[in-house]
Amino acid sequence: MKKVHLKIDGKEVKAEEGMTILEAARSVGIDIPTLCYHEKLAPYGACRLCTVEIDKNGKTKLVTSCVYNVEDGLTVKTKSPKVERIRKMLLELMLASAPVLSERAGEYGIEKPRFESDLTQCILCGLCVRYCAEVKGANALTFVGRGKNRRVAFVDEVVNTGVCMDCRECFNVCPTGKIPRETDGASFEGITVQDVLAKAGSK
């Protein structure tokens, strides 16, 4: 496999061609925060928390490191002032929906989110949807609605026909950590993940 030479946070890195910046960074112990990334799934780039700043031929720009492949001569900054500002803003937005992110938010000096709280706590990262489709092959979850009405919903046709194995693994990958592992055998027909979260939050 051809090797690609780049620099990440001042460190010379040799990475395999086809690797993403995120993979290359982690291979040498450089931490880039993520929420929607999962090693079993294809890169998605939804949460944007893994944004980094790259310098390519003297031109700088921000890219999502989980979907951007390494290139020869690339210079990457994972903690530039611009990157830190963006991560802080993203975390504040997500913290309003998922208080469990408070530990990561604390790293960026966020004590209290500026944004209105959404008690459903779903951050729409898509991990549960993608895990169900790519790993389990069930496609029992999907996105519905647009904009502020966007939600993750169970697909009735799949749930009702038994294609959904009721494995609850989609709950386990949720980065908010707020979906209950046990739901008392409740049916998921006609409800959304947000409904499950809201019910759990009311207990």
What are these regions (language model features)?
Residues 1-11:
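Eukaryote-biased recognition of intrinsically disordered, low-complexity regulatory segments
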